């Protein structure tokens, strides 16, 4: 928390020294736990944290009876010195003087930090990233039980993003959200040696959905390995199931859209 406040305070100090009176700071802190697998063995694990902020500088000015509020945005890192920040903000303030947006009021806040909003319904923000990544790793390999078809490799990325928004009119709010992404390669060595690539992304702890995806991918990969040459062209009875039904009907839905006429 101290580091977070320090970064914001450094930006605020540089804004004041640069003569900027109107501003909005959107600081983002992204933490991640990453797992890399070869077959079922954990090959590498990594944790990282990226902290940066988007700073919008506003400049109020008039020409005749017309009143404007120009703006310019810059992206800053916590590694920047205060001197670097001051120069960037002075340049942004100068650039904002050429942007003739009709004047409008910035959103007003209370001047007090609002309680952080956690997306608790997802159950991702209130667990450690290592725990989240571990749960999805368990789900990923739960269906990998056969010898002829298996997961060749996999990657899992559990991320948590904290966003902190501060402006010159007293707004001070923050929120936190979690997300899990990754990819895996299924391989079947019975018959033809084939591989199937899949990726995934979840905003909640739906590990069962990942299990189903792995199970379906393994089954499809085995079917591909056992595939034979297509029969001659003609009329055949074909049964579609699962996601393939949705996929074929999406063609007709798209073609019936008014924009396609």
Named regions from a protein language model:
Residues 1-261:
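Active-site bordering "gate/hinge" segments
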């Amino acid at each position: 928390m101290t580091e977070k406040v320090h970064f914001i305070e450094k930006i605020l100090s540089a804004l004041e020294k640069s003569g900027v009176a109107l501003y909005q700071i959107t600081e983002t802190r992204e933490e991640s736990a990453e797992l890399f697998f070869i077959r079922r063995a954990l090959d590498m694990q990594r944790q990282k944290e990226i902290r940066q902020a988007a700073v919008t500088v506003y400049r109020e000015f008039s020409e005749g009876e017309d009143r404007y509020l120009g703006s310019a945005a810059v992206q800053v890192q916590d590694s920047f010195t205060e001197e670097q920040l001051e120069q960037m903000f002075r340049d942004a303030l100068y650039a904002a003087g050429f942007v003739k947006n009709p004047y409008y009021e910035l959103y007003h806040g209370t001047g007090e930090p609002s309680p952080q909003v956690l997306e608790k319904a997802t159950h991702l923000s209130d667990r450690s990233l290592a725990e989240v990544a571990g749960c999805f790793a368990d789900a990923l390999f739960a269906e990998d039980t056969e010898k002829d078809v298996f997961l060749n490799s996999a990657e899992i990325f559990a991320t948590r993003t904290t966003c902190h928004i501060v402006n010159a009119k007293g707004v001070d709010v923050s929120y936190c959200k979690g997300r899990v992404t990754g990819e895996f390669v299924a391989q079947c060595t019975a018959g033809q040696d084939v591989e199937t690539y899949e990726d995934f992304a979840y905003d909640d702890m739906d590990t069962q959905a990942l299990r189903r995806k792995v199970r379906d991918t393994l089954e499809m990969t085995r079917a591909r390995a056992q595939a034979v040459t297509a029969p001659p062209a003609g009329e055949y009875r074909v049964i579609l199931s699962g996601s393939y039904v949705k996929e074929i009907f999406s063609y007709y839905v798209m073609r019936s859209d008014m924009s396609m006429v």
